[in-house]
Amino acid sequence: MVISTVLGRPPSTSDVDCTVKYSIPESDQVRSNILDPSVQIFMIIERVVVEVYSRKRISIRIADYVSRQLKGWASRWLLDLTKLTVEHNGVSRSTVIGACSTLCSYYYGIMLLTRPFLIYEIYEHLGASLRGGGTQNDHRQKRKYADAALDAAASFVETLRAVIDTEIMPRRMPLIVWVIVTPSSTLLLTLSDPGSSRQRLF
């Protein structure tokens, strides 16, 4: 999946064959199976790679569809995983690291989906006319997704920093080290323009 995302190509060396009923959790404690939300979020990321980056196009319709999947995932897992990264009493080191990695994957998935809209907004701000029609509602939706890219980047960094401050994070975390480039570049794109009104978000 990491290689597929880097190349912007569909994962041709894998296939989805899953019979797990994710809507019926076996336990109310997320710490009992941290792999479950991780598998789910990577399946959503796979859809972003296939629907957006392999086809090199994005639309409001596709963004809305994947956004609903991300919201469904968040409603089930986000709060519990966040608690595991900030409340360490009685929680194993591996569980905290797993929760952090899964949360970072979630924010990374949001950034993958919404970054094209942020780039669109930056081009517009720089004076490049890219509007190819569309209603006012379409433009509001694009702005909403652009803002979501920034929010996800900030949340990614905050989540990672909170766990790093506990000094339980291993020095070598290849997945997190690799994906940190995305939120960093997303935030730098915005902050590099002194006149950008989006700086107020930070």
Residue ranges and their predicted role:
Residues 1-76, 89-202:
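Extended, leucine-rich alpha-helical cores of fungal transcription factors
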Residues 81-90:
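Conserved small-domain helix->loop->beta segment predominantly found in fold-type I
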